[in-house]
Amino acid sequence: MLKKISIFFVAVMLAGCSSISDMTSYIPFMGKDKKVINLDKDKIDQKSYAAAYEATVATYKDRVNKNFFVDNFASGANDWYLGRIVVPIKQIQDKLYTGGHDSDVYAYYSGVLHAEALQTNFSRLSANCWQKVDSPSVTQGIYDAMRDLQQGKERGENDAYIFQGSEMLLKACTGQ
């Protein structure tokens, strides 16, 4: 009887251990290097990516260090663009600015606020500008910018890809 129980226990343990590696593809922040979003290069809309990257670098330069929760920040931005945030922005701002949050929670909601502000600014260029933007590419631009800032290797204003993409967005949204 003890032998049967032992064999059953070992079989369950082996099955459980083998499925843990499979779970990393379903659980956020496990497995891959880019844990939040990792679009293929051919799936990235240059104008959306570049504008988000440039705005994020301009906003967060000298504010991101190696301990900043970049994945949480990008997850907050991603959740905003996916429509997962049901709490009004004003309420998030009020709670965030009163303090008392753990760094990871603060980073997440900062990402939500950054994404909302970026979307609002796109809409200020023209009423239909946001419809011309690819939100996954925006999220990728935000995420890459935050990761680059964390490593001190952000792309500059003179980067051809970023410059051309930003110009493309201005033309698409303002017609100039």
Stretch-by-stretch model annotation:
Residues 7-15:
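Bacterial N-terminal signal peptides
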